[in-house]
């Protein structure tokens, strides 16, 4: 099993204050999408972070060793062309997991 830190960077610094109705709907779809992966056991935790420099969300995901983590966001609503979101994925060198 491999673990990854995922950072989702918003399209603009003011996103949390001025998202449009369409963007708000997209974020609700994004949350539901990640919850579906959580139900499968691939998402450990996810959510928005109060970073004054730039709005972002983080998640910790786990994938079988032979699975490319990109499979998770290929259908994520926020990763559709034109949304302006960027994703950064960092493999964790080791992971200490509750209950292990």
Predicted segments with their positions:
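Conserved, structured core segments of small domains
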Residues: 1-100
